[in-house]
Amino acid sequence: MGAYLSQPNTVKCSGDGVGASRLPLPYGFSAMQGWRVSMEDAHNCIPELDSETAMFSVYDGHGGEEVALYCAKYLPDIIKDQKAYKEGKLQKALEDAFLAIDAKLTTEEVIKELAQIAGRPTEDEDEKEKVADEDDVDNEEAALLHEEATMTIEELLTRYGQNCHKGAPHSKSGAGTGEEPGSQGLNGEAGPEDPSRETSAEENGPTAKAHTGLSSNSECGTEAGQGGEPGTPTGEAGPSCSSASDKLPRVAKSKFFEDSEDESDEAEEEEEDSEECSEEEDGYSSEEAENEEDEDDTEEAEEDDEEEEMMVPGMEGKEEPGSDSGTTAVVALIRGKQLIVANAGDSRCVVSEAGKALDMSYDHKPEDEVELARIKNAGGKVTMDGRVNGGLNLSRAIGDHFYKRNKNLPPEEQMISALPDIKVLTLTDDHEFMVIACDGIWNVMSSQEVIDFIQSKISQRDENGELRLLSSIVEELLDQCLAPDTSGDGTGCDNMTCIIICFKPRNTAAPQPESGKRKLEEVLSTEGAEENGNSDKKKAKRD
């Protein structure tokens, strides 16, 4: 199924709430994993960020959930800590906060925390495992030395003398034919696989190469990338991945060079003579050869540059949280009658204005004119399918520092920028509610379709006569967007998170039944008639 489950996970995390008396903002939210193998969304519902401000936000993670969860945990406080926030400049505060939390993701302390959130081993843990394995090897060697120290000379000769006699003819034949398992050619290419070499590779597993899943041989690197199990924290290569620099047993190596020493000298002399002859006959100068080599080097360098440009996160072997993962972020602050929305990525905030959808954010896509210009200026490319260097299909996000490595540009001008767009709206009686959601919703339904869907249900009442919970409406929306299977283009197969926030208090209490009202009116009218009748009788008696 690739990135999808065989069956969708439709368990929902939902909730409802309301703000303080000063900000009576009813809200409801729900989140669902859906067809994805993991849940990478996060959100904030904070009706009292301070006594005058409410905050609602959605974070849609990619490459892992760690950056989204980190933002949900720390971004509210980072916003409040900004100087501009304390001065009442909320737009500037949001911009500064987005860039500030993005910068924090590159610090060693935060990278470790992200690794813990993601459940990946940190470098310290890797080092401990490596040291532990080295200690085991040292202990084994010490035990072997101790055993040999207590052995007699006859026992030592028996152990090593017999091995040498048995090994010598075996190694000679292996060197001569090159057919014996474990043989190695002059170019360092490994011969047919040998179980002893596989064991050696496994024992030397906790090294830098094994942890990156790469070997010093490009072919082995390919095997490691294909053969490694997805999601393996250390990215260890399988036994089939062996280094081209692996050494053969010393006995075999020395015997090989003893037998071929004279032959190699003769071969070198013949090679020199042939080179001189070819240069004289063809008129091929060394300068021309150097020029061709320079051209080849230039072409190779250009190809390397192109490959580097088109690299995507994770291709270098070891994934690093915050570099190979990131998140969108759409944050809405409500203070008094002001709604301020900051957005980086393709999550979205939409307001219902007299039943019409009013977009309060702009989806950042690489193919858009402004975004494309920035990406190219930073040295990047956008592929035909709308991906930056063939990888990320977003142009703005928090994290993704793999795309933010141009040292000549400030953070906001990198290929992927964390700088948000800001929109401000003065709320009126026409503004009923707003919706904040990730692209798992917006890829299935348009802004107006979502507003219409909610509008048709927000006044519905349950069997007890009370207004429906907002979270129940969101849950129904998620089910509406969920694809029946994964056979399509991925629409409806993403994680889904959505929040509905009403700008006015909701009268959730059940209305008084009409029959009760009529009975009460009849009683009151009867009593009034009787009083009027009695007064007439009294007047008649007096007359």
UniProtKB/Swiss-Prot annotation:
PROSITE patterns: PPM_1, PPM_2. One of its GO terms (cellular component) is cytoplasm. It holds the Pfam family PP2C. Binds 2 magnesium or manganese ions per subunit. The keyword Acetylation applies. SUPFAM superfamilies: PP2C-like. The modification Phosphothreonine is found at residue 122. The modification Phosphoserine is found at residues 183, 525. Its cofactor is Mg(2+); Mn(2+). Mn(2+) 2 binds at residues 60, 439, 494. The keyword Manganese applies. The modification Omega-N-methylarginine is found at residue 22. It catalyses: O-phospho-L-seryl-[protein] + H2O = L-seryl-[protein] + phosphate; O-phospho-L-threonyl-[protein] + H2O = L-threonyl-[protein] + phosphate. Transmembrane segments: none annotated. Residues 123-139, 259-310 have a biased composition (Acidic residues). A lipid is attached at residue 2 (N-myristoyl glycine). This is Protein phosphatase 1G. GO terms for molecular function: metal ion binding; protein serine/threonine phosphatase activity. It comes from the Eukaryota. One of its GO terms (biological process) is regulation of cell cycle. Keywords: Acetylation, Cytoplasm, Hydrolase, Lipoprotein, Magnesium, Manganese, Membrane, Metal-binding, Methylation, Myristate, Phosphoprotein, Protein phosphatase, Repeat. Mn(2+) 1 binds at residues 60-61. The modification N6-acetyllysine is found at residue 381. Residues 116-139, 163-326, 508-543 are annotated as: Disordered.
